[in-house]
Amino acid sequence: MARDATKLEATVAKLKKHWADSAPHDMRAAFKSDPGRFERYSLSLDDLLFDWSKCRVNDETIGLLKELAIAADVEGRRAAMFAGEHINNTEDRAVLHVALRDTSSKEVLVDGHNVLPDVKEVLDRMAAFADGIRSGAIKGATGKKITDIVNIGIGGSDLGPVMATLALSPYHDGPRAHFVSNIDGAHIADTLGILDPATTLVIIASKTFTTIETMTNAQTARKWVADALGEAAVGAHFAAVSTALDRVAAFGIAEDRVFGFWDWVGGRYSVWSAIGLPVMIAIGPEDFRKFLAGAHSMDVHFRDAPLEKNLAVWLGLIGYWHRAICGYGSRAIIPYDQRLARLPAYLQQLDMESNGKSVTVDGKPVSGPTGPVVWGEPGTNGQHAFFQLLHQGTDTIPLEFIVAAKGHEKHLDHQHEMLLANCLAQSEALMKGRTLDEARAQLKAKNLPESEVERIAPHRVFSGNRPSLTLVHDKLDPFALGRLVALYEHRVFVEAQIFGINAFDQWGVELGKELATELLPVVSGEESSDGRDASTQGLVAHLHARRKA
């Protein structure tokens, strides 16, 4: 069925009324009166558990949210994506990052062309190159083995590889991986400053080979290699992830060191493509294929599971409920896993660049809120930074906890148990809170004077009823990471379909780029700031004065 705008609008209205009527809903009371709440409001896929029972929902909420998914034609749009239809309507492109991890023998067609053989060919070339670097068969210009790789990219060409490389550090048995993204010269200076050009491979990740930040850093790295080893050495110390073969060749990189991808792969969905080359070099082709396999397992689940049993659908529906119905403008991603420290930033781009839109696919203003602000840090660090606001602040911010049942360090299992206890405690504390009477009783138990009890007790009250959901998997390995990231990709898709927006363009990044190009000669003093707004003129004048001081 097609998207039913009338039914969708009516269901949203029902949800808003339902929320208004159930706003006093007390989760503590709900858990006491309903012993089956966890079983009804959780789903599993193999070892991956998704628990949303600590969100402020009931059976009526769940029924209405399912109606919403049907009215938005989530299933139909999902089928269109997997079929290679041009669902990115503003750029007239297919959206097929799922093909990058499709290990089946089925055809995946884009405009009548089966793309799977192309995907396999690039993946096999990546594997051969990675094996050569890792084994030492492919050496630097001086004959030394490559010990370090530097990936130069930005946005999707950086955030995904950074996140995955850190997350899978227990599986590293190849060269050390470093990442440079910022145009700030400090980033590349600090990175190259600790490396030896003779044992370093630089990967330039830019589809067009024109991204200003990436190419500026690439030229700096090129000069670093050429100054140390000579111009002739450049080719042996660079590789590229790009489709601009002429520009890559002009830079000095041979075609057999260039790995491409396709316009049906968006940057924030590209870690599965040749953009993942630094990950593959770090962990090896075999584990990289497990990473892809984990994502594919979630793709199959998302594609085939019915709505009521579909983890990605319900993660998306709960996200929509929190944002558009409850009015929560922020979403905190809290992995209780230090190796997932960069996951919140990765999901920040995935979600905010996809769903940070204010017009529908038809170019009309949206009728309500769209994507939330996404942020986070690992637990337990966050507990000692911003959890104060999450527990006692005036804004309600839903949390999404991510944790593994088992850690990698067997000799530190007692510390992992402490980590697990903290994760569960935060989830429970947000839900339960602490009443004024409970705070008084706790203080009285410490034999404080009555006056002191009354003075301090209000400060120890926690309102509770603050929503959180929890994702638990067995262990953070390549398969589990791939599955987790794909889950969030599909969650973003589901939310976008209900919002009625295109999750696969990012026009919002363009205006600032255009103005930066205009302002560069103004900042450098080659052109006047005349004609610009008074604030910009004042800032330019101040910068000119301070740079000369």
Swiss-Prot record:
From which domain of life does this come? Bacteria
**Which keywords does this Swiss-Prot/TrEMBL entry list?**
Cytoplasm, Gluconeogenesis, Glycolysis, Isomerase
Checking PANTHER family in the record gives: GLUCOSE-6-PHOSPHATE ISOMERASE (PTHR11469:SF1)
For this record, the Gene Ontology CC terms, alphabetical, are: cytosol
**Protein name according to UniProt:** Glucose-6-phosphate isomerase
Q: Name one GO molecular function term.
A: glucose-6-phosphate isomerase activity
Recorded metabolic or biological pathway in which this protein acts = Carbohydrate biosynthesis; gluconeogenesis; Carbohydrate degradation; glycolysis; D-glyceraldehyde 3-phosphate and glycerone phosphate from D-glucose: step 2/4
What species was this sequence derived from? Brucella anthropi (strain ATCC 49188 / DSM 6882 / CCUG 24695 / JCM 21032 / LMG 3331 / NBRC 15819 / NCTC 12168 / Alc 37) (Ochrobactrum anthropi)
Task: Enumerate the HAMAP family for this protein.
Answer: G6P_isomerase (MF_00473)
Q: Which GO BP terms apply?
A: gluconeogenesis; glucose 6-phosphate metabolic process; glycolytic process
